[in-house]
Amino acid sequence: VGRYGLLPETFQTNGVGDSFAADSVEYISYSIGLVDLLERDGIVAWAKVSAPLHVKLYSLSYAVLWRLSGYTTLGVEPLNLLYYLLILSLVFSLGREVFDRGTGILAAGITALWPSLLLHTTQLLRDPLFLTMFLIIILVCASWLTRNYSWQRGVLAGIAGGAASAIVWLVRSQMWEVLLCTALLATAFLIIRQFRERRFLAGNLIGSVLLCSIMAAAPVAGKAFNLYSYPAEQGVSANRAGNVPANGTTATADNRPATPALPTLPPGSPLPARVSFLRHKFISSYPGAGSNIDTDVEFHSLADILLYLPRALMIGLFAPFPNMWFARGVQTGLAGRLLSGFEMFLIYLIEALAAFALWRRKDRLPAWLLLLISLAGMLALGLVVANLAALYRMRYGFWLLLIVLGAEGLRQIFRQSSSTESV
């Protein structure tokens, strides 16, 4: 599509969708620079350079394939395809773990055909890696409520979840509090399960304590890795032929536009200060964007945050609202808005189906865990993310949990209809 200029307002000639995945424009330049560094100075220099983990992984894919594919999205398609298949596999596993195999298959099928997820998993974004690790964590947490682990398997599950949480910290550290709350909530549900069944599940509890401990230590360990800056003096250049953005110039890591400096948050700041800082950061990062919402709202106290909670939950669950579905977007145009409107309509249906599933399966602790994680995540995002385009991508993980619940709700309706017809 990009090479033949079929949608020039949406895709560059290298396949990057700069209208809906603008980050890819920057990440492809960094990836090319890392390939140059790898070929020129070797693997040690490549490993030492400061760059985000997902960009380094994309650079490895390019290092193998750029001579065949050029620096286009095809060069990272094997890695993105792996992410996509892992996401589908994990959604299936989660549906099977919480409900049954049929629900897992239906949930994975819905996910496989989700239009914007398909589009985003063709780009150079952090989202596919984040979603994969996020689903691993959720699957580990859900398994505490469905399985009886030996202490050895409990340790392995805790380490697997902890490793995934460490990668999430490196890829999207803003989600750390949400993930820690997820692990603590799952631990609380595990305690409830033990009281209900009147037995002590040592292996499960060991795994949960281990995961929570690793998550709590992640910020301290993360500070030892300076992976959040891209210093030009380290010699990362992207002077490669074939990487031609839409403006016809060669993209390089050295000539990329400078990002405006934003204030930093002092270490050890309380949670309300962090929420206020993150919201201000999102507002400052998207000046004049057509999909901004409530940019006039800033938090100056805990009371401000508490008063905004209902609005934040509404934004997290339902935005973009129907009045935005048919308005032309600044970057994505009318087609992008229509697609997001179609998907939001489906999400409304899925949310209703999820509520029906919980009503029919109210005894399933893992199902309630998925719901509460989804609500907590979307509430947190509604609090701090004032740009709907960013919110849209960051909600995918929590949408996938709702899709699992919605798939079970749909199957419950089919079962009820079948039983009625048989009578």
Regions found by a protein language model. Give the residues of each.
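Short hydrophobic/aromatic helix or loop-helix immediately within or flanking a transmembrane segment
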Residues: 23-71
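Transmembrane-helix motifs of polytopic, lipid-linked glycan transferases
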Residues: 78-98, 349-352
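Membrane-interface alpha helices of multi-pass inner-membrane proteins
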Residues: 119, 156-179, 209-213
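Perimembrane helix-loop-helix junctions
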Residues: 140-149, 156-159, 178-210
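Short acidic/glycine- and proline-prone juxtamembrane loop motifs at membrane-interface regions
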Residues: 122-129
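Hydrophobic, aromatic-rich transmembrane alpha-helices
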Residues: 312, 316-326, 337-364
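Membrane-interface helix-loop-helix junctions at transmembrane boundaries of multi-pass membrane enzymes
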Residues: 97, 147-156, 196-200, 330, ...
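Transmembrane-helix signature of polytopic, membrane-embedded enzymes
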Residues: 74, 91-113
